[in-house]
Amino acid sequence: MCGILYVESRTARPLPQHLAAVDVLQSRGPDFVRYQHSDRVFIAQTVLHITGTADFYNQSRTDFFAYNGEIYNYRWHGRYSTDTELAYQAARDNRNRFQYFEGPWAWIYWNGDCVTYATDPQGEHYLYRYQDHDIVIVCSEVAPILTYVQNVNVDVPYTNKCWTMQTQTPWQGIERLEPGRLYIDHVPDRSIDNIWSWISPGPIRTQVQIQEEFDSLWTRVMREMTPACSAAISYSGGVDSNLILSQLPQSELVSISMTGKDPVVDRVEEFLQPEQISNLKFLPVSFEQYAEQYHALLERTKMPAQSWSFVGKWMAAKHTESRVLFTGLAADELFGGYGVYQHIEYSTDRSHSPYSQAGDPELWQRCLSAYNGDARQATLLMDYWYQVVGCDAPGQDRIGGAWGKETRNPFMNKRIMQFALNLPWEFKVNTTTKPVLKNQFLREWPNLLLPKQGFAGHANDALPWLNVTIEPTGDRHQDWKQIAQNTFYRNS
C-alpha cells in the first residue's frame, strides 16, 4: 500500500502546496516520502515498506516511478530484488508485461517529457483524476486532490443495493480512471489488460476435477500472497475468511460484531484452535460507536459510505496491528455467493440482481456477449463490475490506506478470478450458493457451515447519533439510502 500523486500545471505552484497534499496522502505510506518537483510538474510517492530492501528508492534517476502495488509472482519474471523494480522496468520499457503480473497495481511514470499511468484490470487499485484548463492531478485518493481545487459536490444517484460508482465521483471534475487502460499524456490509449480476455471456458470437467483444481490453485495463490511479515485477517467466521485462515493459521484475527446483527460472528471461537483464539481481537460495536466511526470515515476519505459495511471495514483496519490485512472481497460475486442468485428471474434484457439492476446497458451487453448470451453468468459479472469495482474494492483500499494497512484480496488474484470466471453455472449456483468454496470449507470444518447473514451495520439504528434527518419510509433499505446520501452531501 502506497500513495501516489502527479500534478501538472501551466502556472507554477509552490512546493508547500504540493507537500500539503502529500501530508493528506501520508497515511497510505507512513514510512517515507519521495518526490520530484519543477515549476510545472510535481510527482510523489508515500511508501509503506512491507518486505525486501529499499535499495530501489535510494538509486539516483532522472525519471520518476510512483507505484502502488504488489506483484505476487514477480520472482517468475527474472532476478528482481522487489516487485517495484520489475514494475518500474515494465512501465519504462515494455508495458505489455503487466498482463502477466498477478496482483494489484497502479502506477505513474514520468520521464521528464511524457507522463504515462495505468491501473490493474480487476479494479483493485485505482487512480482518480482532475483536469481543467490550468491543472491536471492524478492521485490514489480524492482527498489530496481537494487540496488543490474548489470542493463542489455533484449528485451521484443511488440506484443499486449499494451506492455504486464506476467512473464518476461525487466531486465536480474528479473521475476514476478505467481499470486496465493506459493513459499517455492524459489521453486514453490501449488496454494493457482486461478481465474480458480472462473469460475463455475450457473443457467440461467433473465436480471432483474442479474441486481438485481449486484446492491446488488456492494453496499456491495463498503461498505467493503470504508476506514475510505478520498478517491479519478480517475475520467473520464465514466461508471466505475461514478459507484464508486455513492457509494463514498463525494470523492476527480481527472480528467486528455489530451487536445483534450477525449470529455467526458471535461464534467465531468455535472455528479456532486455542492458540488462534489468543490471536483474536473481538470488537463489539454499539450504535453510538458506529456513528462515531462513520463520521471519522467520511472525514478522512472525503467519500461517502457506499455500503453500511464500510464502518466495519474501517474498524477492522483501525484495530489491526499487522501491516497486511487479508479480506474475502469479491468471493460472493465471482463464485455465486449471494442467496438472491437462487431466486432471480434471469433475463437478457438487463441485470435483475439488486447489486447491478440499474447498470449501464452497454456494459450489460458486453457481459452478455462474454458469456454467449447466458444471462445468469452475465448477471454475476455485472455484479462484479458494480458491487466490487464500483463499491467494495475502492472502499476497502481507501479505508486500508487511511490506517497504513495494505489490503490483500486473494479472491481478486488473477489466477483465482480466471478460475471463477470460467466456472460452469452449476458450480456457482445450484441447490446451494458458491458450492466450490463451501466444499473447500467443509474439508476443514465439516460441522460448522452456519447460515450467515453477512456483513451488517448499525446505520439505521445509529441515526440519532449521525446528525442528519431523513423522511422515514418504513423500508430499512430506502431509509439507509437517505442516510448514506444525507450524511455525505450535508456534511461535505
PLM regions and their residue ranges:
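Short acidic-aromatic active-site loops that bind/stabilize oxyanions
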Residues: 207-215, 302-306, 378-382, 406
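Conserved glycosyltransferase catalytic-site signature
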Residues: 83-87, 102-105, 306-314, 332, ...
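Short acidic/histidine-rich active-site segments
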Residues: 324-338
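Adenosyl-5′-phosphate
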Residues: 1, 173-174, 309, 326, ...
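ATP-dependent adenylate-handling ligase core
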Residues: 261-317, 335-350, 373-374, 422-429
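A glycine-rich phosphate-binding loop feature that marks nucleotide/adenosyl-phosphate handling sites
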Residues: 236-240, 330, 454-460
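Cysteine-centered catalytic environments shared across enzyme families
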Residues: 1-296, 323, 439
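Alpha-helical packing segments of well-folded alpha/beta enzyme cores
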Residues: 214-222, 312, 316, 384, ...
